[in-house]
Amino acid sequence: MSGHGAPTTDATTLDASTLRVAVVAASWHTTIMDGLLDGARRALADARAGHVVQVRVPGSFELPVAASRLAGDVDAVVALGVVVRGGTPHFDYVCHAATSGLTEVSVRTGTPVGFGLLTCDTEEQGLDRAGLEGSHEDKGYEAAHAALSTALTLGY
């Protein structure tokens, strides 16, 4: 949901008071992750989410397994992580595995997974999307809004 043409995301229009939500967050790139988590928490509060559990995992590669484990116990999952391109193919492998894994969790379980995994060429790109002061986007908020909105659409 990035860039020109993105839908407006205002979680105050949602009533998630009956939803159980898991937020799964990676630990790398602390400043960016703090912004993503703050954004997700704001969206959950704006939508009055009923029950929220937060889990931290080491990195973005671990997001799918944690999301999979939690998906059976909640109505929506918000997955947050940051991968910044380095000088090796590791970036491509982690991004592909995490993206495919989170998609698989959502399709296999029927539990919406809000996709808040930033795949950035530079740390500055991540900071610009983290919902921090001066950021142009708030991907944590957007990911939480997407998970809640989809869960409500599906009748959770």
Curated annotation (Swiss-Prot):
InterPro entries: LS, LS/RS, LS/RS_sf. Pathway: Cofactor biosynthesis; riboflavin biosynthesis; riboflavin from 2-hydroxy-3-oxobutyl phosphate and 5-amino-6-(D-ribitylamino)uracil: step 1/2. 5-amino-6-(D-ribitylamino)uracil binds at W28, S60, F61, E62, V82, V83, V84, F115. It comes from the Bacteria. Coiled coil: none annotated. The active site is at H90 (proton donor). It catalyses: (2S)-2-hydroxy-3-oxobutyl phosphate + 5-amino-6-(D-ribitylamino)uracil = 6,7-dimethyl-8-(1-D-ribityl)lumazine + phosphate + 2 H2O + H(+). Catalyzes the formation of 6,7-dimethyl-8-ribityllumazine by condensation of 5-amino-6-(D-ribitylamino)uracil with 3,4-dihydroxy-2-butanone 4-phosphate. This is the penultimate step in the biosynthesis of riboflavin. HAMAP family: Lumazine_synth. This is 6,7-dimethyl-8-ribityllumazine synthase. It comes from Kocuria rhizophila (strain ATCC 9341 / DSM 348 / NBRC 103217 / DC2201). The lineage of its organism: Bacteria, Bacillati, Actinomycetota, Actinomycetes, Micrococcales.
